[in-house]
Amino acid sequence: MKIMATGVFDILHPGHIHYLSESKKLGDYLIVIIATDKTAGSHGKKLIFNEEQRRFMVSQLRMVDEAIIGHEDDIFKTVYEVRPDIITLGYDQHFNDSEIEKKCRDLGLNTRVVRISKYDGEIKSSSDIRRRIIELYNR
């Protein structure tokens, strides 16, 4: 079963590892789609690493079978090319699960969307890391 996880993955942290590990448990092949610099920037993200560096880092994680950079213009172009059985979304990804499933059906895909639970640890996002660094250096 092919699982597709998506994200920016700029500053890798335990929340990312939780998301990808839980995604991998759902199937035998995990492909991770990395948001392009342009796509991430259009959502207000200020990136530390460029898309190729982010793809490389994610590709080195044990649970990841493949990491690719997504398409800028149409996210469903990547979905159609990958043809996943399941698309996993993180707790903080603002997509409508049923709309994604409907769009997949329109493309002739029988893809399910699964939300992955929030990581319980203290640092669970890149924003948490940025805040922590600022706190440490402003003491």
UniProtKB/Swiss-Prot annotation:
Enzyme class (EC, first level): transferase
Pfam families per record: CTP_transf_like
EC number: 2.7.7.2
Family label: Belongs to the archaeal FAD synthase family.
Record field: catalytic activity: FMN + ATP + H(+) = FAD + diphosphate
Gene3D superfamilies to which the protein is assigned, alphabetical: HUPs
Function, as annotated: Catalyzes the transfer of the AMP portion of ATP to flavin mononucleotide (FMN) to produce flavin adenine dinucleotide (FAD) coenzyme.
Keyword ATP-binding among UniProt keywords: yes
One annotated GO biological process: FAD biosynthetic process
Claim: ATP-binding is one of the keywords in the record: yes
The protein's assembly and partners: Homodimer.
PANTHER family on file: FAD SYNTHASE (PTHR43793:SF1)
Positions bound to ATP: 8-9, 13-16, 92, 119
GO MF annotations in UniProt: ATP binding; FMN adenylyltransferase activity
Highest taxon listed in the record's lineage: Archaea
Annotated keywords: ATP-binding, FAD, Flavoprotein, FMN, Nucleotide-binding, Nucleotidyltransferase, Transferase
Pathway assigned to this chain's UniProt record: Cofactor biosynthesis; FAD biosynthesis; FAD from FMN: step 1/1
HAMAP family tied to this protein: FAD_synth_arch (MF_02115)
Cross-referenced InterPro entries: Archaeal_FAD_synthase, Cyt_trans-like, FAD_synth_RibL, Rossmann-like_a/b/a_fold
Species classification: Archaea, Methanobacteriati, Thermoplasmatota, Thermoplasmata, Thermoplasmatales
Cofactors demanded by this protein: a divalent metal cation
Protein name (Swiss-Prot/TrEMBL): FAD synthase
